[in-house]
């Protein structure tokens, strides 16, 4: 019978640990605080911001919000970012993206303080991951995948893992994390030849291609452990992953659902990064 790798127990365990860590920091006189910078008022950004604030409240983390006008200039934005960087009461920064065209995201990646960069935008934090140093602030989605694998005690040492997707946000850093835990990693993408066959021969299949229900039963075997990173519009008002869940669920060893899988853990990783950042400041 297929094991469903639900996020709920992973999140519950992480939040309980975070509550204890936050309480310990508060006892030392530190109040872990998240600074949230939002440009404009896109409904999905506002919804996610409110969700993050609620999650922070449940574990004792304070928040400061910086809602900015959609037409803010690069000069004005830089002044706000510098202010938040230099504010000792703010320990981590969350910046909503994508940004409007007048704001240069490549410049902003270098502008954000690496010590407060809990969403791992800064090249300095990504560089650590690629050097095999996992002690700093980690990219949230790859770290969420690793948290699920560890919670369910899925053995990585010597395992063959196929990562489908080569983005700098998920595929590449996740591959480095898997390598650090002694998995043998193959990175695949849209130009990979015989992709279904490559995936079917893996112990762990991680789908991060950004294509709705692309992975069907041709890509998996009965011993496959499938991690679905995708969050796509299913076209019926619902979301779906990169994996065709209904076609695959009864034909694999284990699988993460969408929703209720990787995405649900990602926000908790963000807060874990905040606590890490607070401890180091």
UniProtKB/Swiss-Prot annotation:
Pathway given in the UniProt record: One-carbon metabolism; tetrahydrofolate interconversion
Matching InterPro entries, A to Z? Aminoacid_DH-like_N_sf, NAD(P)-bd_dom_sf, THF_DH/CycHdrlase, THF_DH/CycHdrlase_cat_dom, THF_DH/CycHdrlase_NAD-bd_dom
Q: Which UniProt keywords apply?
A: Amino-acid biosynthesis, Histidine biosynthesis, Hydrolase, Methionine biosynthesis, Multifunctional enzyme, NADP, One-carbon metabolism, Oxidoreductase, Purine biosynthesis
Q: Which GO terms describe its cellular component?
A: cytosol
Q: What is its EC number?
A: 1.5.1.5, 3.5.4.9
Residues annotated as coiled-coil are none
Question: Which catalysed reactions does the entry list for this protein?
Answer: (6R)-5,10-methylene-5,6,7,8-tetrahydrofolate + NADP(+) = (6R)-5,10-methenyltetrahydrofolate + NADPH; (6R)-5,10-methenyltetrahydrofolate + H2O = (6R)-10-formyltetrahydrofolate + H(+)
Q: Name one GO biological process term.
A: methionine biosynthetic process
Pfam family of the protein (one) = THF_DHG_CYH_C
A Gene Ontology molecular function term of the record? methenyltetrahydrofolate cyclohydrolase activity
Q: Which residues bind NADP(+)?
A: 165-167, 190, 231
Q: What does this protein do?
A: Catalyzes the oxidation of 5,10-methylenetetrahydrofolate to 5,10-methenyltetrahydrofolate and then the hydrolysis of 5,10-methenyltetrahydrofolate to 10-formyltetrahydrofolate.
UniProt lists the family membership as follows: Belongs to the tetrahydrofolate dehydrogenase/cyclohydrolase family.
Subunit structure as annotated in this protein's UniProt entry: Homodimer.
UniProt protein name: Bifunctional protein FolD 1
Q: Which organism is it from?
A: Desulfitobacterium hafniense (strain Y51)
